[in-house]
Amino acid sequence: MIKKILKYTKNLILLALSLAGIYLFNLFFMKPFSIDHFLGKELVLGLVDSPEAMTYIGIFDRFNWLTRHNSKLSIPEKDDQENSIKQYEQVIKTLYKYEDSSLSEVQKNTKKIAIFDAENNLKQVKEFPHHDYPLNQIGGIHLNTIEFLSDMHPIRNESEAKDFIKRVNLIKKLYTGVLADLEEQADAGIFPPEFVYDHVINQLSDFINYNYDEHPLYTQFLRKVKELNLSIEKEKLYEEQIKIAID
């Protein structure tokens, strides 16, 4: 009797795994059965592609041992434009495969909105790849990165403190990627309004000519580390590490 129960249990588990495998294969490598599932998948992939977004949401932090998102930043890469074009083209192609006759009224409207959004994004990436200003007087990457780390990155334990330092160490690589984008923008003859330069130069000067006691990455990091109630030796160690990362 026990053997039969174990056999049936084993078969049910294998069946469940097989069905799950078929569903996931269909979801990621074919046109999913449901347009809702397809759009949900795209939303999740968009979030997973941005370590900052995963930190903002917070629910992924418990899986950081797997995702490692809390120690990463979105670094501009040379092939970002090409990858975005391919992604949007694939999304549009898949959306058009869903026949309106098989969709509810809500799904039809969702399909129209999704296609409109994807086609607009594709047009922007193809025709206007350099028409945004990554450095500006309001919320450029130089300000947003500092604000994100000081305000949004959680430090609830030593692991997250170490991740903070890893992210600060990545800022130089991030700025190098942004600089490459700015050079391409300049080669295309696209420049922000002149008044932006003075604001950005002043903002960058504040980060370059700093005292540690005034730098938000230093002050916020130490404040959060002190709340962990670590030993004085560990606090001193982390203080030295964040100084090195900022330099």
Model-predicted segments: where are they?
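N-terminal maturation segment of proteins
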Residues: I2, L6-D247
